[in-house]
């Protein structure tokens, strides 16, 4: 059973009842799990998470979206800005577990060419 190395840190940040951000660390990968709605009222919270991770020299980030119900253009903008910042430091952001609706937003907006997207967390972790 390989559970001991999976969870070394777990932080929760709840923004009302619209979005919850859960942070974990698996080996050298920061996992940012987003639950709920990522929109103009919650996007700055996710932006703060990325800023903090960058300041800690955390260059590998997996954004787990299996419980992300909705993403607006403000949420897409935060992800795009984070991708640009990570590219500057030779870091990488990957996404995993997009629902069909969220994946469709990524496809329509062209974001599937910006981010590596995996069906599951485990697939993404193996790709780092």
What annotation goes with each model-predicted range?
Residues 38-114:
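Amphipathic alpha-helical interaction surfaces in cytosolic regulatory modules
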Residues 2-33:
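Short beta-strand/loop segment at the start of cytosolic alpha/beta domains
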């Amino acid at each position: 059973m390989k559970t001991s190395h999976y969870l070394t840190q777990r932080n929760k940040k709840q923004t009302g009842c619209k979005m919850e951000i859960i942070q974990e660390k698996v080996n050298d990968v920061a996992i940012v799990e987003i639950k709920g709605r990522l929109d103009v009222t919650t996007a700055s919270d996710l932006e703060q998470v990325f800023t903090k991770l960058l300041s800690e020299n955390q260059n590998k980030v997996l954004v787990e979206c299996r419980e992300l119900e909705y993403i607006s253009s403000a949420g897409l903008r935060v992800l795009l800005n984070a991708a640009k910042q990570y590219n500057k430091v030779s870091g990488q952001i990957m996404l995993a577990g997009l629902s069909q609706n969220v994946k469709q937003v990524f496809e329509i907006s062209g974001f599937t060419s910006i981010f590596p997207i995996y069906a599951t967390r485990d697939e993404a972790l193996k790709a780092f």
